[in-house]
Amino acid sequence: MRTHTLGFPRIGGNRELKKAVEDYWKGAATRQQLEDAARAIRLRNWTLQREAGIDVVPVGDFALYDHILDAALLLGVIPPRFRNDDAPRDIDLMFRMARGQGGDRPVAPLEMTKWFDTNYHYLVPELDAATTFAPDAAPLLALIDEALAAGFTPKAVLPGPMTFLWLSKRVDGGTRWSLLPALLDAYGALLRDVAARCPLIQLDEPILSLDLADDIRSRFVPAYARLRVAVPDATLLLASYFAPVGDNLPVALSLPVDVVHLDLVRGPEDLTPALDILTRAAARQPADSGLPQSGSQSGIALSLGVINGRNVWRVDADKAAAPVRAAVAALGPDRVWVAPSCSLLHCPVDLDAETGLDPEVAQWLAFARQKCAEVRLVADMCDLNGRADAPETAAALARNRAALAARAASPVIHDPAVAVRAGTVTPEMGWRATPYTARIAAQRAALRLPVLPATTIGSFPQTVDIRAQRRKLRTGQITEAQYDAAMREAIATAIREQEALGLDVLVHGEPERNDMVEYFGEQLRGFCITANGWVQSYGTRCVKPPLLYGDVARPGPMTVRWITHAQSLTQKPVKGMLTGPVTIACWSFVRDDVPRPVVFRQLALAIRDEVADLEAAGIGVIQIDEPALREGLPLRRAAHAAYLDAAVGAFRLASSGVRDATQIHTHMCYCDFHDIIDHVAALDADVISLEASRSRMELLDVFATHAYPNEVGPGVYDIHSPRVPSIDEMETLLRAASRVLPLDRLWANPDCGLKTRDWPETRASLAHLVAAATRVREGG
């Protein structure tokens, strides 16, 4: 029985990668210094895994920006605007594709979107009829050599060809699948080079956890047959995760691979049919038949993902061991591997760094390093060669059971008052008093905005001084009063800047918020905050999800004093800025002892109370951000309705207790709305803003097809790139939007908040946005 991981956090225990990459971008570090920092992180990652008991470490899971971008470069998928005959395929090209910066002029970066149903974002490879794959395994081979030289047993990790193509975009409108034969040739060449140094290769095919059309599913077997011909002697591990493989299981287990990984956290129901398929295959092919076992059903091993790779709660080792024992009984220990459910990319690195957590809560947790030890514990519990009875196994199991028992009995988890409040909710509380078509007149009379009003999404640059003030407060160098004064001045600066730019609806800029979810987690009961529990969101952007461990309640107002201060400084409307209940849940590490709809409702009631306080304080525009609503959608359609009903109900419960004249906004990120547009409309937000610039407004088509009735603010510039788009570029996007939706139902805004940008580029971009909106408004 072997232990392995599908991937490990790449940011470093103290976000060393973020600092190294950003220093390189600023010219404060050389390429050699960046490469040295990356090498040190990889070595530390491999060492932590081996010390925790992992037999085989992943190589290729590490990326300076994004692993799908790395795969595109390995395959030579480089769009023409990034090509330069004299430029090598190196990290500068990679960063240019990610950010649009570098070279002789700024260009539009690759589109970015969510990685399945997680809060990680990947860069979308671009394909067209002229795409020619040019594989070059050298970067991956260098990493393999690095691991071998350090004495590790490596497993090369690559996205599988079917998933790579699925995640890519045909920019010329053609079908992606016409490029599959050429892509398989490129993969075959890559795998041949890799297998010569590292015969164990993991190919990630998470699209096997989706509802696949028959014509897509049918391509898997011939595709993998070609790969097997390319590397007949390699050990191929096919990995799927994030949902049950379900009806794709017969295909997955018929592929000519040696190991198939199943996510038994998200898809425990996959185990029984998988064992049935494999044991029946073995019965049909006797061991002495003389036929090759490798790559046939009768010889396939199962990698069982029994440790949750997406949450931070300590595993129930007894529960996790049960499917492993069942697999060992059916297949034998040599055909069973133990692993986390998915890459540990989605977890913080090391719980040992959290010295300030409440010890009671800390004992319930496991971060990436601890999850590796949990993999080892579960494997040892199921070992047939003596480890199950070893004293160290017994001691680790005793600690695990004690922690779980303590959590179950803890009085800090349950708040009777929260249950009483939830019991008072009525269906009428989830509906506005009148439909949008009736209340829009009251809002326009109250707000007196021009056609195509210009606004921003919420946050403004978090300057060095703002971050320093927060750090000084945390370390006791300044008082609360001094901190409040500094934040009020930052808010005043944001208001002055917006008025000078000519924006129509202003925001306070959120200087007091370190993160749009963590800020609320700090003020709501039922949460605790880590000091170093960072996870990667995209590139160098890291987030620190709060830990939602118990019933949620709001002790008092959370945002009112900041928003009312901002409103006192201007005659223009200032938006109240809140994070919605679904996003708070999706972007937190959420308790696993109650159903998700229970958490949604508790959070919705807390936000509802905050909305009421903002309205009572005279705030006429209130934005409740739900960027994670689409992200939280289960991958399988069978689970969609229950999730969407709970999510929409939570948003409406949070937002519907206001007068007609109060305008409710929401914001969503990187979404494909086609399959949920009815539910987006059911939110009944007066205005929805969304990220649309990288897709060149393609996202709006669904709003026209659906005849979406309310107002829309399509993002007209990408805030994830430092590039300042021109007035003409934004005008073109706004005019494209006006061909889809009437001008009197459109807003002009950036794609997202401006927290990560600097003031010079923010001023320039917003000035261009206002100018573009004015042109379109005046030109009709």
Swiss-Prot record:
Annotated protein name in UniProt: 5-methyltetrahydropteroyltriglutamate--homocysteine methyltransferase
Cofactor note: Binds 1 zinc ion per subunit.
Pathway annotation from the record: Amino-acid biosynthesis; L-methionine biosynthesis via de novo pathway; L-methionine from L-homocysteine (MetE route): step 1/1
Cofactor: Zn(2+)
InterPro entries: Cbl-indep_Met_Synth_N, Cobalamin-indep_Met_synthase, Met_Synth_C/arc, UROD/MetE-like_sf
MF annotations from Gene Ontology: 5-methyltetrahydropteroyltriglutamate-homocysteine S-methyltransferase activity; zinc ion binding
Residues reported to bind L-methionine: 457-459, 510, 625
Residues reported in the UniProt entry to bind 5-methyltetrahydropteroyltri-L-glutamate: 15-18, 114, 541-542, 587, 631
Reactions catalysed, as given in the entry: 5-methyltetrahydropteroyltri-L-glutamate + L-homocysteine = tetrahydropteroyltri-L-glutamate + L-methionine
List of residues binding Zn(2+): 667, 669, 691, 752
Binding site for L-homocysteine: 457-459, 510, 625
Enzyme class at the top of the EC tree: transferase
Keywords: Amino-acid biosynthesis, Metal-binding, Methionine biosynthesis, Methyltransferase, Repeat, Transferase, Zinc
Active site, UniProt feature: 720
Biological-process GO terms, alphabetical: methionine biosynthetic process; methylation
Biological function: Catalyzes the transfer of a methyl group from 5-methyltetrahydrofolate to homocysteine resulting in methionine formation.
Family the UniProt entry places it in: Belongs to the vitamin-B12 independent methionine synthase family.
EC number per UniProt: 2.1.1.14
